[in-house]
Amino acid sequence: MLIKAVAQAVPSYTMSCFKLPDNLCDDLTSMIRQFWWGKKKDEKKLAWISWKRMCQPKENGGMGFRDLKSFNKALLAKQGWRLQSSNQSLFARVFKAKYFPESEFTEASLGNHPSFAWRSIMSAQAVVQKGKRWRVGNGRNIQIWTNDWLPSKSYPRILSPHQPPWENAKVSDLIDEAAGAWNNAMVRQLFSFAEADLVLSIPLSQSLPVDRIVWNGTSKGKFSVCSAYHSIREMGKNSKEECSDDSEMKHLWKSIWKLKLPNKIRSFVWRACREALATKANLKKRKITKDDLCSQCGKGAETSLHLFWFCDKAKEVWCNSKMALPFSLDHSWSFIDVMWQLVKHSSTSPGLMEKMMSLCWEIWKERNSVRNGSGKRESKVLVRNAASLVEEYNAANERVVFKNPEFSTKWHPPDSPRFKMNVDAAVFSDLRAMGAGMVIRDSQGQVLAAMCKRIPANLSALDAEAKSMEIAVHFAWEMGFREVYFKTDSSNLKNILTGLSEAPASLEPVTASILAQLDKFRFISFCHVERDGNRPGHILAKFAKQVGDSVVWLEETPNLIENACSQDVSLCNFGVL
């Protein structure tokens, strides 16, 4: 905590304005590294793990410490992004007038007699160039083959070969402006299968707003130093042909850091998995000692596996704990192999990892205290202390769950003269399409209008919910309803539309189109309801898979939702709600 919150944060202000010399970064890193390994004045300490590995993310087996050079560049990239996106700020106007009056920051050059501040910001130009991406609105400002506009962090630019006469075409040429949707056939004709799917996954708004440059490193399209830092680290990996841990190892490391135990024990488990504990076997490997025999039982080399499971003292502790591993140990294993097996059995034995690792922690503390001259403790004491650690942690971190009163589990009628519209979406992955379903009812529960619509767009669940809501708002207006409650079973969409959270960059055109309609209505409200209270909308959205384009019902109840609507009304009439 001290390293991340203090030592690595102290130079942040300076690093956000200027590029620190590499030697200074190395000196700061050296001091931080020595502090971590406990070095004091005139005292040497062994660095068990390289600092490069310590700076890897926790999910990749590191400690998540910052690499100061990369962090410095990420902070400078923030200034570069401000020059790129905030053209009207005083900071941007001054630098633009002096260094790139006729171009953008990503196209600027160092120029003659540049200031140190400009040199520093320019060192992060490549980061800004790599991270910027166009968010498609109407597509009129985006070149199909020369601009980055695909929603992909790895390949945001079209790689499919040019097809004459499309070399200089713009994204707007792929959009059916009358329908506010992609020209599905044209997209499939021009691009590869995977790229066509990516294009069709971009939600379009019926209002077709202007295109905008966003940051590709975050879902909301806003620059963050954290995302820029990770981008820089990935760029460094690619240049050195390094490989990150595979998905299984990531799962293991994540499981370790999610243990419901104090941080000191999680760090201990991480060190044990990295073979960074000062066991006699590890010390012998580093030629610090010649003897690796276990000092407690004298029956074998003191490896982590021997110390925690095969040593006579460890066996006595485990016997008193009445806990047993749900698998057989192999003498050739290391500590990380045991952890991996425990992770595999965590679903069938919940809480077992926490209990076992807290007991390993007590065994390790006991071993160290005995080596330092303290008296031995009984095994029962170690077991009791380990159990107390788990209980105290759980008690301190117990969460009280409050039921959210803002949504209902069943449908209930609106107050007259208002109306209620249930809206839902369905994603048809096999057809690379989505369905929108909506039904509007009055205070008596009578169906006044309903619609289901199939859209050839390969959208995510949230994008599909937002697109359905946009269609629903326009449909309600066209049908003449001016006071409407719009109900959705997507809490994320409800939070976005009510201002409780920000929309992802890809959704901005759609949510902006929805919110632009608010002034037209005398009353409008967006509410969350659970799936049980949204059954008619859900059924219609699913039914859209069977229709060619759209089906509308006016002043009649569609047969497929008649039972669901009747059940909603009957529950209301009998006062269940």
Q: Which residue ranges define each predicted feature?
A:
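A helix-boundary/hinge signal
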Residues: 1-577
